[in-house]
Regions:
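GHKL/Bergerat-fold ATPase module in large chromosome/replication-associated machines
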Residues: 86-241
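Ser/Thr-centric signal marking residues that sit
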Residues: 43-45, 186, 191, 246
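GHKL-type ATPase core
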Residues: 1-112, 116
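Short, low-complexity, polybasic intrinsically disordered segments
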Residues: 240-248
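Core catalytic DNA strand-manipulation module of type IA topoisomerases
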Residues: 32-35, 220, 245
Length: 248
């Protein structure tokens, strides 16, 4: 949101989600002001923005496919959340009645969450049902905190960590891993993906140990485990550390 707002010359923040309500326009240099009241019992916020033409070319257009992909991704990551995306740029109306003749709209809701996400991402035939791995733990992190003298002091802080993973294997050879931290995509992976892959390798190695599936001279490697796998790895924790605005 901060990036979108930074590249807009005007943002409108009406006080209600649907219907009429007070509009609070913001432009570069404008301050906060009271513009009106919403009716009792009416809740929600609708946010609009207008692209800054000093940044974008006059013929720049929003990509429907990219917006739909992002909305679908969020719907997968938040089970039960319903997102409706509608393109009103090319609406055709009846010249006599004014009725809408054609519009593009898609409703997205996935109660199965990332299990459905893994099935959606997979491009091959499954060899097993989607497996779900979930867990919670806590850890201690040392962070600089402001002390009573105005200085920064290293302080131990307890953090809670949640992990939710959906994975399946298919008949293909490609590996697809999509990872997220607090529903923010991490396209280049990170320590959470490295830990997942290492843990998966250890689990397979331990499971095969003592069996006759592998010869004594053979050992399983990471590529053996990841081949044909589709996985969605999600982590939730307070104050994650990203590298830059791209959340890498």
């Amino acid at each position: 949101k901060s990036t979108v707002w930074g590249m807009s010359f005007r943002r409108g923040v009406p006080g209600v989600f649907e219907g009429e309500g007070p509009d609070a326009p913001f432009t570069p240099g404008s301050g906060v002001r009271k513009v009106g009241k919403a009716k009792r019992g009416v809740t929600g916020t609708r946010v609009r923005y207008w692209p800054d033409r000093q940044i974008f070319l006059p013929d720049a257009k929003l990509s429907w496919s990219k917006l739909a992909d992002r909305a679908r991704q969020t719907a997968f990551l938040v089970p039960g959340l319903e997102i409706v995306i509608t393109d009103e740029r090319g609406i055709q109306t009846d010249p006599e009645t004014g009725d809408v003749l054609e519009t593009v709209s898609e409703t997205m809701r996935f109660d199965g969450g990332i299990s459905e996400f893994a099935e959606y991402l997979a491009t091959d035939q499954p060899v097993n049902n989607v497996m779900r791995l979930q867990g919670e733990t806590s850890f201690t992190e040392t962070v600089p905190m402001l002390d009573e003298n105005g200085g920064m002091t290293p302080t131990d802080v307890d953090r809670d960590l949640g992990v939710d993973i959906a994975l399946r294997w298919g008949t293909g050879y490609d590996t697809t891993v999509r990872s997220f931290v607090n529903i923010i995509a991490t396209p280049k992976g990170g320590t959470h993906v490295q830990g997942f892959e290492q843990g998966l390798l250890r689990a397979f190695s331990a499971g095969l140990e003592g069996t006759r599936i592998l010869k004594s001279s053979e050992e399983i490697v990471k590529d053996d485990v990841l081949e044909g796998m589709t996985a969605v790895v999600t982590v939730s924790l307070a104050e994650p550390q990203f590298e830059g605005q791209t959340k890498e």
